[in-house]
Amino acid sequence: MIYQEGYVYHIKDEYFEKVQDSNLMQNKEGGTYRPTFYCLRDNKTSLLWMVPLSSRVEKFKAIHDKQVAKYGKCLTIVLGEFDGKEAAFLLQNMFPIREYYLDHIHTRNNNPVPVKHSIRREVTTRMKKIRQLHSRGKKVVFPDIDRLEQIMLAEVKDNATE
């Protein structure tokens, strides 16, 4: 699967089987490809950073609003619209993968569904801030992204030597 910026993807089960991280939002059983993931390329490593989308907007709006009330902002959840429905972009659950693990792009009537530019910009900005906080030792993301990144970078290195 070739990555295209600005779209949402589904991930192969193989990724979840490989990394074994209980904090990741896994594909649903029964062959349905959920959740969907917005993805951004890290130009330094070539890895893709996946941000799960949730349709459970009320649940995440309550968490978002509580953080805004307490801290004046919420970095880890972006509320917006995707594919004509309200959605929560869960940066608190983001993680890295290789392009190899992309299964397919999310479509509606066989057409790829883009993420609105304003949401893409907001997610990108917040992701950069979260990664900066993480690099300074702040725990803002649930998955063990350091371990996941090392697994993916090792695969990139192994594939480069094959």
Question: Residue locations for each model-derived region?
Answer:
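Short beta-strand-centered aromatic/proline hotspots
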Residues: 35-40
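GIY-YIG nuclease catalytic motif and its immediate N-terminal context
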Residues: 1-33
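Short His-Asn-centered micro-motif
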Residues: 11-13, 41, 51-53
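Sequence-level motif detector for i,i+2 pairs with an aromatic at +2
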Residues: 3-6, 45, 86
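C-terminal terminal-subdomain/extension
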Residues: 64-162
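Residues that form or immediately flank small-molecule/cofactor binding pockets and catalytic motifs
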Residues: 14, 55, 99
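A broad, low-specificity signal marking well-ordered, structured residues that form hydrophobic/aromatic
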Residues: 7-9, 48, 89-95
